[in-house]
Amino acid sequence: MMKLNLFINANETESYIDIHAPKMNDHVQSIINAVNDLDKSHTLVGYIDKEIHIINVSDVITFQVINKNVTAITSNQKFKLKLRLYELEKQLPQHFIRISKSEIVNKYYIEKLLLEPNGLIRMYLKDAHYTYSSRRYLKSIKERLSI
């Protein structure tokens, strides 16, 4: 059981969080990730032709670079974004994982993984398609997915 203390002090100039724990573990790390995600963007602006759409980040399955444009792919739409992939990566919550130079995947949409003989990971996503990780990101992917 975790204990929570809240201290309201009018003399404080900004809000901050201190975490006290006997050791670092998955539970503590998930709290840190949740707090860090509070400052992250939860919506994005996407374009379909000349239409402007507000996209809920949690609906995005993957962000891919297609013909030099960053595209947000949901279960039923593809939206062009005006951000570069590296800019987007900084804004996204922790459950988005960079898997290659041209793709970021929402880990909540990963259905299963297949380790290929060549060292790549084939990721099957819930929208019935699959994608591949690059070797360069393999260590990071394994850490983020705890495999």
Swiss-Prot record:
Identify the InterPro entries for this entry.
LytR-like (IPR046947), LytTR_DNA-bd_dom (IPR007492)
Q: Which domain of life is it from?
A: Bacteria
Cross-referenced PROSITE patterns: HTH_LYTTR
Q: Is Transcription regulation one of the keywords?
A: yes
Q: What is this protein called?
A: Uncharacterized HTH-type transcriptional regulator SA2153
Q: Which GO terms describe its molecular function?
A: DNA binding; phosphorelay response regulator activity
Give the source species. Answer: Staphylococcus aureus (strain N315)
Instruction: Give the matching Gene3D superfamilies.
Output: LytTr DNA-binding domain (2.40.50.1020)
Q: Where is the HTH LytTR-type domain?
A: 44-147
